Amino acid sequence: MPIIEQVGAREILDSRGNPTVEVEVGLLDGTVSRAAVPSGASTGEHEAVELRDGGSRYLGKGVEKAVEAVLDEIAPAVIGLGADEQRLVDQALVDLDGTPDKSRLGANAILGVSLAVAKAAAQSAELPLFRYVGGPNAHILPVPMMNIINGGAHADTGVDVQEFMIAPIGAPSFKEALRWGAEVYHSLKSVLKKQGLATGLGDEGGFAPDLPGTRAALDLIGTAIEAAGLKVGSDVALALDVAATEFYTEGTGYAFEKETRTAEQMAAFYAQLLEAYPLVSIEDPLSEDDWDGWVALTAAIGDKVQLVGDDLFVTNPERLEDGIERGAANALLVKVNQIGTLTETLDAVSLAHNAGYKTMMSHRSGETEDTTIADLAVAVGSGQIKTGAPARSERVAKYNQLLRIEEELGDAARYAGDLAFPRFSVETK
């Protein structure tokens, strides 16, 4: 059994220049592995809690307290445990914290240890992480949901929708899907320049032009897809992350595109978009606590498009189970730092798949060079991954890892393609 011998931690910087936690785990057999923890910009109220230092250092965003939690409390609790006993290790972490939202030790401290333990166990077993976590049948390469126009909390513009994504569903392989996405991305830059629009980048590597609204952004992307020699819809479909919680006020409604709208009016807006554009997925179209609106929206258009719960579910099995019972959404966004351990993440994915919900593995806007989520996407067979534009090394690192995995799988590799979106029919677009 690969026994945990050492646990270390340090404060490093993420892609936004903010501190985050990196954990190193050493085993008795000499294996050493590390994991770095991401951080979000638009965070759900129900997420597990990051531990930040406050004060003036790093403008209050330091993580020395989380590092101390790893060194002083977590390390003594897990040293001597088997790294291949992931569920036991993660339960020990949850029990040690003792709070429902991991606020005592910090989800950033706990997750760093959880992931580093899994990576060390895989390395000790001489298995790639995707194979160690996913077993012998892990072979599905996900569709890269590339965020090529950034708005909302990811950019300083007037665009309310947070992410405009492309999904290269018609590609024959992940390698080709990545090429198509990169070509559309560069094509979009040329389109923006020709129209005199800004080509500065948002947090996730997408362009951040100031546009009049959602349709203008979708039209620009459609033009870029065609300019790249690809077909809008059958080759490259479109997707949104609205992040509606960011512009929702209880009792007032949704302050969206210079109007105050009800959930019903937002639903009508999305229905109109579906008639005009080949959208395969809409994430967080309504606020995280607007359960009635979610249920009505799912009943209205859930048979036509993937409706993804991010802030709604926060990768939490309890909230997901509630949503399944209510009939809210039909897909789960998977962010490991929302729940705080690998075991709980895998439990949420299993619950979603068993209920017929799709899953999309996801990065955060504050990322590092850590590529764990690329392996997890293949391990759980999510068929979709959201990890930014094909630009900025913290985003590209995940795509490059998926290229390596596809190459390692060889003839056994299968690219999810349009099978990842069974509700989408290009003939109707």
Curated annotation (Swiss-Prot):
Subcellular location: Cytoplasm; Secreted; Cell surface
Necessary cofactors: Mg(2+)
Active-site positions on this chain: E204, K335
Cofactor note text: Binds a second Mg(2+) ion via substrate during catalysis.
Reactions accelerated catalytically: (2R)-2-phosphoglycerate = phosphoenolpyruvate + H2O
Coarse class of the protein's main subcellular location: cytoplasm
Top-level lineage group: Bacteria
Function statement: Catalyzes the reversible conversion of 2-phosphoglycerate (2-PG) into phosphoenolpyruvate (PEP). It is essential for the degradation of carbohydrates via glycolysis.
GO MF: magnesium ion binding; phosphopyruvate hydratase activity
Pfam families membership: Enolase_C, Enolase_N
Residues noted as binding Mg(2+) in the record, renumbered to the chain: D241, E283, D310
Family stated for the protein in its record: Belongs to the enolase family.
Name used for this protein in its record: Enolase
Top enzyme class: lyase
Key words of the record: Cytoplasm, Glycolysis, Lyase, Magnesium, Metal-binding, Secreted
One example of a Gene Ontology biological process annotation: glycolytic process
UniProt entry tagged with the keyword Coiled coil: no
Species for this entry: Mycolicibacterium vanbaalenii (strain DSM 7251 / JCM 13017 / BCRC 16820 / KCTC 9966 / NRRL B-24157 / PYR-1) (Mycobacterium vanbaalenii)
Binding residues for (2R)-2-phosphoglycerate: Q162, K335, R364, S365, K386
EC code(s) of this entry: 4.2.1.11
Recorded metabolic or biological pathway in which this protein acts: Carbohydrate degradation; glycolysis; pyruvate from D-glyceraldehyde 3-phosphate: step 4/5
One GO CC term, this protein: phosphopyruvate hydratase complex
CDD domains according to UniProt: enolase
